[in-house]
Amino acid sequence: MRILLTVLIALLVGVTSAPAQQGQQHLIVTSDALKWVDPPTFPGAKLAIVQGDPSKEGLFVYRVKFPANYKVAPHFHKASENVTVLSGVFFIGMGEKFDQGSGKELPVGGFVSIPPTHRHFAWAGGQETLVQVHGVGPTDITFVNPADDPRKK
């Protein structure tokens, strides 16, 4: 009975994971191959897509370079957001009001995972800060206070 159960589990895993693997290939991206653009949501920062398209279904990865002391007003996303600090220091706070006193410092290697629709804000430390954001799209950004949305200015 145990052998039969083991065989059935192995077959089930093989059958359910095969479609996910079909059509996929590995991806290697070097930092010099990234195309940096001026994102309308973060004026003064730079953004590069590493993989996928955040506005469409599926995995996405992008990087954002923030100048020293850059502030991101309270906002939220319809998908989970996962952020890793690659260089500099990044601060993250939770809530609908920008409050540096309640933020958490994330040094290089620091990570934060933010659930969908969870209000949060962020800022860079005293030097240029590079973060990598990944998740499963589609996602977006909605500023808590519409007046903070740079796309509307």
Predicted ranges, named:
Residues 72-74, 92-93, 114, 119-125:
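Short beta-strand His + acidic residue motifs that chelate non-heme Fe in jelly-roll/DSBH
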Residues 67-70, 76-97:
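Glycine- and acidic-residue-biased ligand/ion/polar-headgroup-sensing regions
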Residues 50, 109, 131:
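Divalent metal-coordination and catalytic microenvironments
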Residues 53-55, 67, 90, 96-117:
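Short acidic-glycine-tyrosine-enriched beta hairpin
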Residues 25-27, 101, 121-153:
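Double-stranded beta-helix
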Residues 6-15:
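Bacterial N-terminal signal peptides
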Residues 1-4:
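Positively charged n-region of N-terminal signal peptides that target proteins for export
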